[in-house]
Design a protein with these regions (language model features):
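Rossmann-like flavin
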Residues: 98-207
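A conserved FAD-binding loop/helix module that cradles the flavin
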Residues: 497-518
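A glycine-rich dinucleotide-binding beta-alpha-beta segment and adjacent secondary-structure elements
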Residues: 187-201, 371-379, 434-500
């Protein structure tokens, strides 16, 4: 006979959004169970020890975290009590060029502007002006909107037009990131620098109605932070917080199906046959295809919504080919001799010399071709956090954007993995010549197909969990008419990155979903979620 458990709510998937959602509802008095199919919680926060050399740690997915300590859920849930620590390297990013020059993103905007001025004084002036003009836009609109359920655009536009800061936001809303970049910056290397940083956040260069994201990125800053003890330490931190608050979680036991009866979600069946009844709700932290097509089943959906779910688009331009190295010594870049300040950078970009190369990569990814030329971003985590490698040694990695559906079949990655790894490493060596065979102790790589195999939430290797374009962003995420974290199945909610505000380690989907679920259940909210409509009314 199957084991039977009873809870008020079940959260499917112990990625950071799932755990955040569970925490808010558990602290509201509900008895919650979080179910995770992998051996450990964390989702995209996964980190592994090198399989050949113990003591070398590799951050498998997420590593560049931004402003986490100031986010509402971090503060509300008191995560500082559970031992988390972040390093804040400066510069946050260095883009190396073969002529030994570089572009850098520093905490001090004037230092960033100074590096841009070496390539184009006009671009430097433009960058500083965008940064100045968009400071209030980010603080008063973009950031608050991240942590609130999205408004319908017609309603939002009416409210935004009443304030100067709102009108500035709207000015570039109907453009694409590429249009903004090419209209405002003239130097091809500056264009490549800004464009690539946007792409590495999951932006589509030609994504409709997302042009505003580039000035927002400039004003917000690209100053990534590193979690001490690898990114998985944040997952551990969240798990400790759950336990501290009496919230249960299960690892290494995924959900086989969601129980639906008379149009209502009533619980889940786990892979081992355990039945978990959910008195109030089920919240899914996994993507819509996995949630609705596999776990709910199309027989429990009307035909129109079933088509919406099956048609959810995954990005063709966010999958990566990851190269991880265990080293005797850190990579030493060709720019260091003339510019020693680059040594302390967190993110390093190599191989990308012009904006045209970035555009070519988009075409290659979308047509399923190997990139014409490798160019990558990565880091040397052990330089900033000594716990990630043995004393005197180093870890480093590089990520190359690459197509999932290579030559029409993702299985082709199993055939060309070794060849592409060599090309990627060869390009890296042009910029860090000390990456010799003698220096490299161990190598590891992961193709876009490997990423999907490891985490089935990342369909097609898409760590953004859904293409981020105008018709699949904000009030259209995951689908038009279904942006409020609810679903057609009563009692079933979405709380993952397929919802607003999308991928990356923001916690926004989990935070926002918790507010919606709590409201539907009539709970007394112990936190203060933002009413974005009321907020914009007051802003005007």
């Amino acid at each position: 006979m199957s084991k039977v458990l009873k809870y008020d709510g079940v959260v499917i998937g112990a990625g950071h959004n799932g755990m955040i959602c569970a925490a808010y509802l558990g602290k509201s008095g509900k008895r919650i169970l979080v179910v995770e199919k992998n051996m450990e919680v964390g989702g995209g926060l996964d980190s592994h020890e090198d399989r050949n050399y113990p003591g070398f740690w590799h951050n498998i997915h997420s590593v560049f975290h931004r402003g986490l300590l100031m986010l509402p859920w971090y503060q509300d849930l008191g995560l500082e009590k559970f031992g988390i620590h972040y390093y804040k390297p400066d510069p946050g990013v260095v883009h190396h060029f073969l002529d030994k020059t570089y572009l850098g993103w520093f905490a001090d905007v004037d230092r960033t502007v100074s590096t841009i001025s070496r390539f184009s004084k006009k671009d430097a002036v433009t960058f500083k002006e965008i940064w100045r003009r968009w400071q209030p836009v980010v603080k008063q609109i973009v950031f608050p909107e991240t942590y609130a359920p999205p408004l319908v655009m017609e309603q939002k536009r009416t409210l935004l037009e009443k304030s100067s800061v709102g009108r500035e936001y709207l000015k570039f809303f109907n453009t694409t990131p590429e249009q903004f970049i090419l209209e405002h910056f003239e130097d091809p290397r500056v264009q490549a620098f800004i464009g690539f940083l946007g792409v590495m956040r999951g932006y589509e260069l030609d994504g409709s109605n997302t042009g505003y994201l580039i000035p927002a990125m400039i004003a917000w800053g690209v100053n990534p932070q590193l979690c001490r003890g690898t990114s998985h330490a944040l997952g551990d931190n969240l798990a400790h917080m759950l336990s501290h608050n009496g919230i249960d979680y299960i690892e290494a036991n995924g959900v086989e199906r969601i129980l639906v009866h008379d149009g209502r979600a009533q619980g889940v069946v786990l892979d081992d046959g355990t039945v978990v009844h959910a008195r109030n709700f089920v919240a899914s932290n996994v993507n819509p295809v996995e949630t609705f097509i596999r776990l709910v089943g199309r027989e429990n959906l009307d035909s129109q919504f079933g088509e919406l779910a099956a048609g959810f688009r995954f990005s063709k331009t966010t999958p990566i080919f990851a190269t991880n190295l265990a080293l005797n010594e850190r990579p030493k870049y060709i720019t260091e001799e003339q510019h020693p300040e680059v040594i302390g950078s967190f993110m390093h970009i190599v191989g990308l010399e012009t904006y045209t190369e970035l555009r070519n990569l988009f075409e290659d990814c979308r047509t399923g071709q190997l990139p014409r030329k490798p160019f990558m971003n990565g880091a040397t985590p052990s330089y900033h956090d000594a716990t990630q490698a043995p004393p005197g040694k180093a870890t480093a990695f590089m990520w190359q954007l690459a197509p999932y559906n290579l030559w029409g079949n993702p299985q082709n990655w199993d055939k060309v993995r070794g060849e592409w790894f060599k090309r990627q490493l060869a390009m890296w060596r042009h910029y860090a010549p000390n990456l010799t065979e003698e220096n490299i102790l161990s190598t590891d790589s992961a193709t876009p197909l490997d990423i999907e195999r490891h985490d089935r939430n990342m369909y097609c290797g898409d760590w953004m969990i859904g293409e981020y374009t105008g018709d699949q962003a904000l009030e259209n995420r995951p689908f038009p008419g279904w942006s409020q974290y609810r679903t057609p199945i009563e009692g079933l909610y979405l709380c993952g990155s397929s919802c607003h505000p999308g991928g990356n380690i923001t916690g926004g989907p989990g935070y926002n979903a918790a507010g919606i679920i709590a409201g539907d259940l009539g709970l007394d909210l112990w936190w203060k979620p933002l009413d974005f409509r009321e907020y914009l009314l007051n802003l005007s």
